[in-house]
Amino acid sequence: MTGRARKIISSIIFTAIVFLLWNPAPVRAGESEFEFYYQRIEAVEQINNPKPEGWWDKAKAFVKDVGNKIAGTFEKLSRTYFPGEGEKRWYSEKDKNIAYKLQRTKVKSEAHLLELMGAKDGDLSKLTDGQKALLAVYRHSRSQAVKERMDVSYRSKIAVTLSDTTGFDDAKKYPQVENDFWPCSTGRMIQMSSNFFNYAGSDEDAQATFVHEFSHSCDRTVKEFIKPYGKDGRHSCNELTRSRSAFVEGWAEFNEMLDFPSERSRIQSAIQSVKIEKENGEYTQVDATDPSLTGKNLMNVEGVVANIFYRISSELPDGRKKVFEAFKNTNIYWRTTKMMLRGYAEKNPGDAKALAAILNEETHGKLSDAEIMYYLGKGPGVMEFLAARKAPSADKITVPELTAPINAADQGVTVNDEGTSSGNPFTAGSTR
C-alpha cells in the first residue's frame, strides 16, 4: 500500500469517527434493563514470574507479559459486552503477575442471589457486611426511584457485576483486591464490590454508589481527554476541575442527592469551600465566596453543578421531570452544564427567571450578565432577572496561588483509570 493510499484511508477513518462523535445515534425508545451477574473469587493465580533471573527467564517473562496484556485486554472487552457465565479469569490492573479465578453466574432473582452468597434460607446473618451491601444494591435497582430513571438511559441493557471478594479481603495477603474490584462504570457495565463496602451499615453507601454509577451509564458525555481530574487522578465534589468533567460528576452526584438525604447534606456542606489542585499535585482550599474564584470557576465544580440541578428539581414546578427531559434532549458526547441549562430554559421559559436566580445564588452572585446569558440564553425571564439584580463589576478574576491547607478528612477519591467513557473515581476512567 502506498503512502498516499494510507493517508486517504486514515482520513476516511478520522472523518467517520468525527461524524459519529458529533452525530450520535438517536436515543432509543423504551427503557433500559439491568442484567445482574454475581461473581465470586475462587483463587488468586500467579500468571508470570515476578522475579525472573537470567536472560532466558527474563525473555520468557517478557513474552508471557505481552501475552497476558493481550488476553487481559480481550477479557476486559468481553466482561463488558459479553459477560457470560462459568469460570472466568480477571486480570489484575495493579499487579501484572497475578489474575483472579472467578465463578460467574447470572442472577435470576433475589432468592437466587441469596443462595449464591450462601444464605439460601434467607438468613441474612450468614452474610458478611460486604455481601449485605451487594444485596442492598440489587434491591435498590428494583426501587421505584431507579425505575423512574430507566427511560433516561440511551442503552437497552446495562450489565451489573456484583463481585464477592469474601475470603480475599485481607489487604496484607491480597493487597490488590480493593483496586482491582473498585466500584466503577464503563458505560455498558457497572462493577460493584463487596470488598469496598465490607463494614457495618454500608447499605446506603453502596446504594448511593450504584445510583452514581448508573447515572454515568446513562450519560454519553465524554470527559476531557487529558487529565480531566488533574495530575493526581483524584476528584471530590468540591474540587475545581473542567467543564465536561464537572458536568459528568455533577450529574451523577445530583442523582445521589435525589435519593439520599445524607449525600445531599454532604455535598451542600462541602461546596461552601473549593479545592484547587496546584502544579505540584498538592491542594489548597478557599472559601467559595472568596474574590479569587470567579462564577465560571464555580460552574466547573461538580458539587455546585449537582446542587443547581437538585434545586431546579426540588424548587421549580415539575422540576425533576423537566431536568430529566433536558438531560435526554441534550445527551451528546460534548455536553456541558451550559448545554443542559440552556436546553432547560428554552423548553421551559416560564421557569427561566427562577432558574437564573438559582444560578446566581449558587455562584454567589459572581456571574456577570453576559455569563448568565451564556448559560441560560436571552429569554424574557432571564432578562427580567438581570434587570432586577445588581451585576458584579468584573467579568474576569484570576485565581492566585493559594496557601490554605486542605482538610485531611476530604482527600477526594482515586480514579480507577481502566475504563472508557464514563467519567467517575468509580467509573472506569471516571469517579465517584
Regions found by a protein language model. Name each.
Residues 12-21:
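Bacterial N-terminal signal peptides
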Residues 30-50, 70, 74-133, 139, ...:
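Fold-level signature of zinc-dependent metallopeptidase catalytic domains
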Residues 54-76:
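Low-complexity, intrinsically disordered, cysteine-poor segments enriched in small/polar
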Residues 2-12:
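Bacterial N-terminal signal peptides that target proteins for export
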Residues 208-224, 249-253, 257:
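Active-site recognition of the HExxH zinc-binding catalytic motif
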Residues 24-29:
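Sec/Tat signal peptide C-region and signal peptidase I cleavage site
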Residues 123-192, 199, 203:
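Auxiliary, metal-adjacent structural segments of Zn-dependent hydrolase domains
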